[in-house]
């Protein structure tokens, strides 16, 4: 598991029961595997995924072998604190979990950290990457170029927000100026994903759910 969210650990128990194989995750994610109700699910999450069955995880080390592939484990916080990526240096593959998700950036979860995601992506961009394997976009060729494109867009957005903040505009006015009205994701998720979360995380330099 790249991280502890319900849509990533949901099949663990069935896989273990069917194949009897270990499930690996970062050490901090293991309590969520053993007790999935530690995940505070919103209504939309309960409708789509609900809480998974309990499963037993094993702490992943600095590398892992899978067939003829040798993956290096990279700590990749931002989407969650326990997020990891897997890098295969010979094939130049990067498995990004929920960290990459395409070159555009509009909506942020309330428990994500925009600036931390940006710094992690910049770290990953130092790798030689031929193909990104993304949870949302599938196989993305020219992976390093895709990362650099996303980084550039995120830096431009960050700079615009900070510039307007320094001119005295409040977060909601900045969101309206740069991104316009909220979209369907804000309504469907009850604000869990929103444009405002993106602006707030840049404006205050932290996760929106930690802003007083």
Model-derived regions: residue spans:
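Short coil/loop residues immediately preceding or within conserved phosphate-binding loops
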Residues: 61, 68-71
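Accessory terminal helices/loops
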Residues: 126-130, 139-212
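Active-site HxH/HxHxD metal-binding segment of metal-dependent hydrolases
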Residues: 1-64
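Metallo-beta-lactamase
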Residues: 70-77, 81-160
């Amino acid at each position: 598991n790249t991280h502890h969210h319900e849509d990533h650990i949901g099949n663990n128990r069935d896989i273990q029961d069917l194949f009897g194989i270990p499930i690996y995750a970062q050490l901090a994610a293991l309590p969520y595997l053993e007790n999935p109700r530690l995940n505070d699910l919103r209504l939309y999450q309960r409708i789509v995924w609900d809480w998974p069955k309990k499963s037993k995880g094993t702490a992943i080390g600095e590398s892992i072998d899978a067939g003829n592939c040798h993956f290096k484990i990279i700590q990749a916080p931002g989407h969650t604190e326990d997020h990891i990526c897997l890098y295969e240096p010979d094939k130049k593959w990067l498995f990004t979990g929920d960290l990459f998700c395409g070159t555009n950036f509009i909506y942020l979860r309330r428990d994500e950290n925009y600036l931390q995601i940006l710094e992690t992506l910049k770290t990953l961009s130092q790798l030689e990457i031929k193909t990104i394997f993304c949870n949302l976009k599938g196989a993305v060729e020219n992976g390093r170029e895709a990362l650099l494109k996303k980084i550039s867009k995120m830096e431009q957005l960050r700079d615009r927000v900070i510039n307007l903040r320094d001119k005295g505009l409040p977060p909601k006015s900045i969101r309206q100026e740069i991104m316009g009205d909220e979209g369907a994701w804000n309504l469907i998720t009850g604000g869990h994903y929103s444009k405002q979360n993106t602006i707030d995380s840049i404006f205050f330099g932290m996760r929106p759910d930690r802003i007083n």
